[in-house]
């Protein structure tokens, strides 16, 4: 879940 935000 939070991994997606880390990509940003």
Swiss-Prot record:
Q: Tell me where it mainly resides.
A: secreted
Top-level taxon? Eukaryota
Lineage of producing organism: Eukaryota, Metazoa, Ecdysozoa, Arthropoda, Chelicerata
Keywords from UniProt, A to Z, are: Secreted
Tissue expression profile of the protein: Expressed by the venom gland.
Record localization: Secreted
Secreted found in the keyword field: yes
- One GO cellular component term noted in the UniProt record for this chain: extracellular region
Under which name does UniProt file this protein?
Cryptide Pep-19
């Amino acid at each position: 879940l939070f991994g997606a935000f880390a990509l940003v």
